[in-house]
UniProtKB/Swiss-Prot annotation:
Ranges spanned by the short sequence motif 'HIGH' region, renumbered to the chain: 127-137
Broad class of the protein's primary localization: cytoplasm
Family: Belongs to the class-I aminoacyl-tRNA synthetase family.
GO cellular component: cytoplasm
UniProt cross-references to HAMAP family, sorted A to Z: Arg_tRNA_synth
Domain of life of the native organism: Bacteria
Location in the cell: Cytoplasm
Keyword ATP-binding: yes
Protein name: Arginine--tRNA ligase
Length: 580
């Protein structure tokens, strides 16, 4: 409906340009917002205020001209001018009912899918395989996963890329430690990667002989030595298995097939350097090969270097990222490359994207976007740590989430068996961790708070999961009793109308999530939907409604609410429960 209204306004502006009211060559950006005050209608625009100066007109008079120029239509029931020139629009009930019916009759809830499907390559998670995944890896994995699900739902081809770190000097240290252990000990110690890494690091720091051996093994590994590759493959296999366990528990759709590791680009890196040389972009600086871009300068005004090859011949992240960009466009056919990486890498990606275009690693109008995110903080305002002050392993965090959720459920009266309680606790616990993150603005830091995320009140996973079971319970009680699914929808009560207005926003919100890569818009929508359904449920009898037409209508509204909640949570990677 938002798109329809934008089209009507575009036609009105076109008419005013033709009349000379607005300069014909003036570019107009039509922006519609949702008013917080429901008395101001369903949509509002400040278009008249923005165009008043170029039109040399009083904003309110221009607003009147815009309203008069809107073509006759069935979309709107009312247009009002407020204050100095804001225009408020109210959607007609007939239009609302038609949209609700279309949503009920569609497996995809009548969401507008892309007319031309794009190939979107999404880089997310991408942990360093030298260690186990920790709490710092949470945001990339679940935000990237939610956005990829939404893009797929909106009709795009999504190619997931897990650009894991599996190369570099630290792997020499790990291989040297594996070599020093017998097979049985190595297998045992690899079961806890964090312990393994710490033990290897301690040996590296304390023994010069061990450190020398580690450096030798790095050189051998990078030159393709069969023995080193065997040890390395053994380590990588164990580490990837640890990652997959975490993805499976989190409900993240990444698999081994999505792994395109740093090492996969090794053979392409000499070609990257040669290509930059041919383009005349390389400069040698203290023995290293660098690119200096005028667009990025230091405090003294000097161009900042992008180092692509070290003095000793080794390559850096920048080199690998350039190779990956070229591969993702030219071999995977990406139209849009999305990167979900910590906000602290913003400058790195700005430089790499600029260089990729300048050097011709990408061609045409391909989109390159880095979507940074903030940090998970503790209550002390510092990055979240375990109780002993160390880094919290993600697997341990999920264990604690399940334990706390089980304790919460056991405090409530339930007819669930012990086994069912454990399953519900698993879903509630892990969903609470995910939702607490996804419901925050992606670009902001947030405080990790068990008490807040594991409550049945407010914008939390337990609240939404319970809201779904509450809607579902209506149909459990209805049982096999038939109701007329083709009955007219009636919106006679203000709570019915409020619920209907929220339901039809689903399409708009999903496109907002895709365009901004911001899952918190969907979380906010679902929270508002659950709240409006609760008000509707309390005020409007459903199963006990004697008027059959009203009863059928309210059952249809309830069914659509359940469908939207279920689909919305699924797009966030959160499974629903039939009972809690």
């Amino acid at each position: 409906m938002k798109e329809q209204l934008e089209q009507l306004l575009a036609e009105a502006i076109g008419q005013l340009k033709a009349q000379g009211t607005i300069p014909a060559d003036h570019s107009v950006n039509i922006q519609l917002d949702r008013p917080r005050d429901k008395s101001h209608g369903d949509f509002a625009t400040n278009l008249a205020l923005m165009l008043a100066k170029p039109a040399k007109s009083n904003p309110r008079q221009l607003a009147e001209a815009i309203v008069a120029a809107v073509p006759e239509n069935s979309l709107l029931s009312k247009m009002d001018i407020a204050g100095p020139g804001f225009i408020n629009f109210t959607i007609s009930q007939d239009q609302l009912k038609d949209q609700l019916t279309a949503m009920l009759n569609s497996d995809s809830l009548n969401v507008d899918v892309a007319e031309e499907s794009k190939t979107i390559v999404i880089d997310y998670s991408s942990p360093n395989l030298a260690k186990e995944m920790h709490v710092g890896h949470l945001r990339s994995a679940i935000i990237g996963d939610a956005v990829s699900r939404v893009c797929e739902f909106l009709g795009h081809k999504v190619i997931r890329q897990n650009h894991v770190g599996d190369w570099g000097t630290q792997f020499g240290m790990l291989l040297a430690y594996m070599e020093a252990l017998d097979n049985q000990s190595a297998e045992y110690e690899l079961s806890n990667l964090e312990t393994f890494y710490k033990a290897a690091k301690q040996r590296f720091d304390e023994s010069e002989e061990f450190a020398d051996r580690a450096r030798q093994l790095v050189v051998k590994l990078q030159s393709g030595d069969e023995y080193c590759l065997k040890l390395w493959n053994q380590f990588i296999d164990v580490s990837l298995s640890h990652c997959q366990d975490v993805y499976d528990r989190l409900g993240v759709k990444l698999t081994r097939d999505d792994v395109m590791a740093e090492s996969a680009y090794n053979d392409k890196l000499p070609g990257v350097i040669e290509h930059l040389r041919e383009k005349g972009l390389l400069t040698e600086d203290q023995g290293a090969q660098c690119v200096f871009l005028e667009e990025y300068k230091g405090k003294e005004g000097e161009p900042l270097p992008i180092i692509v090859q070290k003095k000793g011949g080794g390559y850096l992240y920048a080199t690998t990222d350039l190779a990956a960009i070229e591969y993702r466009q030219k071999e995977l056919g990406g139209d849009h490359l999305m990167y979900f990486v910590d906000a602290r890498q913003a400058l790195h990606f700005d430089q790499i994207f600029t260089l990729a275009r300048k050097a011709g690693f990408v061609e045409g109008d391909i989109q390159l976007n880095h979507y940074g995110f903030g940090t998970v903080m503790g209550k002390d305002g510092k990055p979240y740590k375990s109780r002993d002050g160390g880094v919290t392993k993600l697997a341990d965090l999920l264990d604690e989430a399940e334990r706390r959720a089980l304790e919460l459920l056991q405090q409530k009266t339930t007819d669930l068996s012990e086994e069912q309680q454990k399953r519900v606790a698993e879903v509630v616990g892990i969903s609470s961790v995910k939702y607490a993150d996804l419901s925050k603005n992606r670009t902001s830091d947030y405080v990790f708070d068990w008490n807040h995320m594991l409550t049945f009140e407010g914008n939390t996973a337990p609240y939404l999961l319970y809201a779904f079971t509450r809607v579902n319970s209506i149909f459990d009680r209805l049982g096999d009793t038939a109701f007329d699914r083709n009955a007219d929808i009636i919106l006679s009560d203000e709570r019915e109308l409020a619920l209907a207005n929220q339901l039809v926003r689903f399409n708009e919100v999903l496109h907002q999530v895709q365009d901004k890569a911001m899952p918190h818009f969907l979380c906010g929508f679902l929270f508002d939907l659950a709240g409006r359904f609760s008000s509707f449920y309390e005020a409007c009898p459903i199963l006990n409604q004697e008027d059959e037409a009203l009863r059928n209508s309210r059952l249809k509204l309830s069914m659509l609410t359940a469908n939207v909640l279920k689909q919305g949570l699924e797009l966030l990677g959160i499974p629903t429960l039939e009972k809690m």
